[in-house]
């Protein structure tokens, strides 16, 4: 406005406007000339700011800045500057007073940028009306571009503003433009492109491009949801990034379905103090929200301050129990450290980056669960010695709120795949009869899914504690080998060890007073398992803790696709049955050299139409049993596609029980507070087997958290300050000298 206020008002005041009108130029040429001249001055002022972008790129840690997003932000700034310019020219064309032109232009620009957004916040606008009102203002469209997202809707909106005020200026000059028709055409264009919108995501990781399945799920939502993001207030920058990314994602959801979602970013407990504050946190913890104590650096002294925060969100839909989302990721990243250290320092920035990558999946899944019309039935199988005690407490709690969970006794009937979507077979200890296997086989032939969590050998840590330090693990004899082999999988009778493993407290000697010295030592019988990054079940999850796993081989079966989900690390070995479980395993001299194998499979996904184990050998008694129990005939091959996950360590899905604290989460040992990704692996497996395939597809999204390298900033602080403060001024000065020199030579007489 300060630049454009002289455009026409000075011409009116000095009487030169009449001279200009006598020149052979049209009103369009006159307005365009004024517009381009003023916009050129604005661009000259903006271009030196590119120096800031180059400086940030040089000081960044990994990957540099996202130049695609930077280009998009400059596009947005260009459109915004163009709109302010044309508005200023229009206001200048209706007044002779420069000051009036300046003040009115500022007011109009401010109202267009902030006014509609503020109006949309009023409580009277509900059911999506607030979203459409905010879209009338400049801010909503500029914010998309500033993030690197170019949409047809935003571009058409900005062009409409330019055309509207440019024609207004021409009308003031000529007075013969059909203004009403123009406005009607512009409104029609904006409505059309708001419905048939397309976008160009300039960001490097395509962070604003939602997966196709996500778009379909959000568009189909018919129950409005309210999201509470508890990441407001003074929190570390890496959590700020998560909050901003979550808000941006929810805004994209709202653009797809304005009635689907509303949200706010809250400061947890800002209205409470002392005991009331603790009660507030306790109530949120009861709902399942994560409560985390963090240490933040405060001020230039880098003094560390303890702080409670809630890195989670609560989604509410009327008439349903709310769903809690943990915005963190189970996959932890660590700074470079000496391997001798027990507890490496977590790289919070990198971990937060992994969390951002999972936001689309987490919010989409929660909204899908709250809006689905049919809830799948999952049955926990009993009848063959499966545990029904506290060791499967977390397993039940993990899925009982999202699915219909029940117990099915295999001895009492045939599981019906039309009623039961998935069977959970967890740690059976008794052999399966031929009739048992027939029941499971026909369940698979009918399209039912099964999770097999089996212990091939009898090997328990409790048994070791009752011996002198060693015992022999033997075959559990479950009689399932032929059934699994028919489906293309074989669990071998062995134990797998790996040097990347859990550390257990062990007696390593005696102190001076004769008391035992206890130290946590690596125990390769409890290896950490790595996920296959190419499959959504295990993509972007942390290590999975296992207890005495066996190796798995896959066998070619026509029409069956098999995918390795979990495997050991790069320093593994196999102990064939009868395998000795020794407290000192891996410690003997020269023994480490035997860990030469790598990536031994421990969990496998098999999917397709499976062949029946009993093909060509089903007896008349079996046929009668099937007919009597199901009312249907024997199925020789699968009539529908089925999915099976075979895990060679049942304890991956069970939890330990602490004497004082009770049942622990999956993947947590009593003497550690670190929780491995066993729970994530389980719930992702359940989602893959029971929900639409596309629901997990968004887990594959990767986003790089672009942060400054603090060491570079500190080393070059003075130089950076000098460049950022004086650099733009120097560039503007050089431009002035070059421009004035050019004009002198161009117009010299």
What does each model-found stretch correspond to?
Residues 50-59, 125-140, 700-703:
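Peri-membrane helix termini and adjoining interfacial loops of integral membrane proteins
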Residues 4, 16, 52, 86-87, ...:
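Hydrophobic/aromatic residues in alpha-helical transmembrane segments
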Residues 95-146:
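Transmembrane helix segments
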